[in-house]
């Protein structure tokens, strides 16, 4: 199959990478797993065993007229422990390479079908200035875009830092969440070739 390149000849690409069927269930699973892996999972609360304080019985069991009490660290007391205390945990989910690559291929194929993938020969700015990048995006009628290059261009990266709806990645930095988060994905021809090799 062929991808149209802005201002150049069409680029021949593999149908297994850019012409794959849309697999919503697989994409959902991989995106959820990716987001779960980004969770910090470090929250921690103290149980009644961990709260600082005496284990002494505050008053005798009977005869005071007050409710019976075993220690001041009871969860129903102010400053007591938490009943079901949250503990640090690993939220990551296992996704094998075949599934991950399949999801990326499925997303790229859907971007092609929806005409959200914009292929260019190269994408550069002459200096790390936001105004140069804004003008370049305006020329392509874009304002919400993920830009993928074969290797990370420092000028381009610095120029994009101040733009809310623009992100710059190299091929190694792409992930399923960023691919579906933007209206358009701008990709260079060199990056397309690298992605094909990476997902082969």
Swiss-Prot record:
Record keyword rRNA-binding present: yes
**What's in the keyword line of the UniProt record?**
Ribonucleoprotein, Ribosomal protein, RNA-binding, rRNA-binding
In terms of Pfam families, this protein maps to: Ribosomal_L4 (PF00573)
Q: Where are the transmembrane segments?
A: none
Q: Which InterPro entries match?
A: Ribosomal_uL4, Ribosomal_uL4-like, Ribosomal_uL4_dom_sf
Query: GO annotations under biological process?
Result: translation
According to the UniProt record, one GO cellular component term is:
ribonucleoprotein complex
GO MF entries = rRNA binding; structural constituent of ribosome
This protein's superkingdom? Bacteria
Question: Where in this protein does the record put region Disordered?
Answer: 43-72
* Ribonucleoprotein found in the keyword field: yes
NCBIfam families, per this entry? Answer: rplD_bact
Family to which the UniProt record says this protein belongs: Belongs to the universal ribosomal protein uL4 family.
**Cross-referenced PANTHER family:** 50S RIBOSOMAL PROTEIN L4 (PTHR10746), LARGE RIBOSOMAL SUBUNIT PROTEIN UL4M (PTHR10746:SF6)
The subunit field of the Swiss-Prot or TrEMBL record says: Part of the 50S ribosomal subunit.
Function of this protein?
A: One of the primary rRNA binding proteins, this protein initially binds near the 5'-end of the 23S rRNA. It is important during the early stages of 50S assembly. It makes multiple contacts with different domains of the 23S rRNA in the assembled 50S subunit and ribosome. Forms part of the polypeptide exit tunnel.
The record's annotation in HAMAP family points to: Ribosomal_uL4_B
The protein depicted here goes by the name Large ribosomal subunit protein uL4
Which organism was this protein described from? Answer: Haemophilus ducreyi (strain 35000HP / ATCC 700724)
């Amino acid at each position: 199959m062929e991808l149209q390149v802005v201002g150049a000849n069409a680029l021949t690409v593999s149908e297994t990478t850019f012409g794959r069927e849309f697999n919503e269930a697989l994409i959902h699973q991989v995106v959820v797993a990716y987001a779960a892996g980004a969770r910090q999972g470090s929250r921690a609360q103290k149980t009644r065993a961990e709260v600082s304080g005496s284990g002494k019985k505050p008053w005798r069991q009977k005869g005071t007229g007050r409710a019976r009490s075993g220690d001041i660290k009871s969860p129903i007391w102010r400053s007591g422990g938490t009943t079901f205390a949250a503990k640090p945990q690993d939220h990551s989910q296992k996704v094998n390479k075949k599934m991950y690559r399949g999801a990326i291929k499925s997303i790229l194929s859907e971007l092609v079908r929806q005409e959200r993938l914009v292929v260019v020969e190269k994408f550069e700015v002459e200096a790390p200035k936001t105004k140069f990048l804004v003008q370049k995006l305006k020329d392509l009628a874009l304002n919400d875009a993920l830009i993928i290059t074969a290797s990370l261009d420092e000028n381009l990266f610095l120029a994009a830092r101040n733009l809310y709806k623009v992100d710059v990645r190299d091929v190694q930095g792409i992930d399923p969440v960023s691919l579906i988060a933007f209206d358009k994905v701008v990709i260079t021809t060199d990056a397309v070739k690298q992605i094909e090799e990476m997902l082969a």
